[in-house]
């Protein structure tokens, strides 16, 4: 797509705050009015997928897709066409410093919680996997509880559930993944009784085979790339096998769901929560009250906001994946400027900006350089 000729540089921008109450379709309707004001460029607040209901968009949960609350790709393309037809340009707000991780809706963060240091996205976040507190070795602290862990556990405010072919821990709006290797705790409970009753029926043998496969999965502390790839491949196969088995065998489904009930304990019987406690101790995260965040948290945040985790933009793979959408728009000639949010929070702001300039400047000079502005003014030292 060839951009409509306009001024060589954004001379007058008008910021449009995008949210579910002001979408791409709404923005499209404002373009003629903005042109009449002499505006050269529409400047959009973040348009990547943000936390549901976000009214600002800076809590991005997936940087590589458009925010569905703002509209679909066709509606965005119509907005772009309208901007071009009126001889105007487009400037985007970019958020490289942090991501929204609240309610485990961020797929990168969710992957880290499920797979720990062996997660494909473990290097995306600034997590101290070896903090002074030994209980947090190879774990990330999750200060999401409204009270002390023991009180929440025994009040049954969090519960084990089986949903979408996986075991998860549900705590109000949080749906926390459980390491597939730890599923052996759930599936092996009362197994001898099932074997006796099932008389080695094929469904029981399949469950035993699934248990063997789970036990052989590489652990969450695995660092060998080949073993990590094996972990990702095999865990998905095992998930599918268990889901199929539960769909086809009422006996196995009843067995598993009864174990889920048992693991959730009985209020008033402290010892009945030992099974769930042991299961949670096997995870790559440690649940805690929000009150301990300032003292024990081991991941870098945006200021002191627990729901905004800092990103390691100095990692090349993280940089490329998180800027996928922006780089695509630049190549297509859709965007000619960007405003970088909180650049001073990055590990190396200058290096980041130089790298962004390199990747957005065509070597053949076919396009004008991307206009890059930053939110913060950095001191000369």
Question: What residue spans do the PLM features occupy?
Answer:
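Catalytic domains of carbohydrate-active enzymes, especially glycoside hydrolases
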Residues: 27-51, 75, 325-337
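Alpha-amylase-like alpha-glycosidases and glucanotransferases acting on alpha-linked glucans and related
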Residues: 3-11, 15-21, 53-59, 64-91, ...
